[in-house]
């Protein structure tokens, strides 16, 4: 089944699943993630550094360049981030690479610096919206894009002790010696230039606008306010006191209730909530309503269409976008594409087809003219741009998009592929599709990171959604796939 479907009109019989993306043993859809020193250990980080430092240096040597590999590193505010930073750096310099440290910063800033300053690759130490005791390693190529699967497969092979590359097997890769041992460079200036870049994208002054920012006690805590202050906003910040254990704790884009309350009680014009590494953004309008990634795609897609700037007349979404978004796009005469879940796949489609905007319901929004990955702070600037250009409140800009009720159930299973492909499950899904017709849709898909099958229905009422979700979930249970 293709990872992308492209549509113009509202649809009947939505494809039941996105393409099952090949997952590695360690790396999932968004890096190597797990509980610190449980699933993801300091030893893993050291070995990732060892491989990347050697591999990119070897690539350069084979192209006649004897200079060391240059690798840029950023991290979140988790307690374990320092441990992983030190062990990654140890591996990199032991293999002869130079490690450049942005210190606490956002994932999109690492992507920006990797691209602009021509690094061989970038590493972000982040578990995004996960709790503090988790962490992760995100790999970014020299173009500021998420790392290709071929390179990731080599990293995994090295972790498992069966690396084969450059025409031979490597039981161990060589250590650098003497003057070939790598250097460690403080590179906070790179983060500061990223802040300057964001400020330069401000089309309008935000003078007099009361903006609330929820930084999730994460990596945007000392970046977002600097940007909004420079553009003239009256900036108010919550959850910007990271202590190593409070990242995403009842804060940020996955716990947006606090920001909703703050906006209403303090008369804010708008609020923006980021996740731990600030690659996603959700908004709160002046009435306290949540503005999701789907709303953002609607608002900015419409804005670009009205200005004649929507190249290919297409907004790129994932299969998890709300049914109502496509109805709204039909009303506007905007085409849309649907990819597998993951901003990586949204970006790949955008690059291949020349699209300017795409993203996910969760708030990963990509503006391909300005960035190579989702960027939460950039997203908030673009929403501010539309508000200022149209001289409208955010609640007014969201009018025209009606969110369909949605029920999503995560079923923990013993074998997610077998459960999803089961003939009885497929028959139940087909029956639901036929009964919903063009009044809703069902989507059944495997999680990319957990032993979970997700069953989601969107329809005109929550009762209808629940009825059809239960129908499919019960078949999964009756056929013996539920774990524990």
Residue ranges of model-derived segments:
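Proline/glycine-rich low-complexity loops and linkers
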Residues: 153-195, 200, 286-359, 366-367
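An N-terminal, well-structured beta->alpha segment
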Residues: 19-90, 94-95, 184-211, 417-421
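Gly/Ser/Thr-enriched, mixed-charge loops and adjacent short helices
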Residues: 35, 135-266, 484
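N-terminal small/polar loop signature for handling phosphorylated ligands or for N-terminal nucleophile
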Residues: 62, 70-134, 226-284
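Short, Lys/Arg-enriched N-terminal segments with co-localized hydrophobic residues
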Residues: 8-22
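Phosphate-binding and adjacent anionic-ligand microenvironments
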Residues: 270, 307-484
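Gly/Ser/Thr-rich active-site loops/lids in small-molecule metabolic enzymes
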Residues: 146-148, 237, 289-308, 376-385
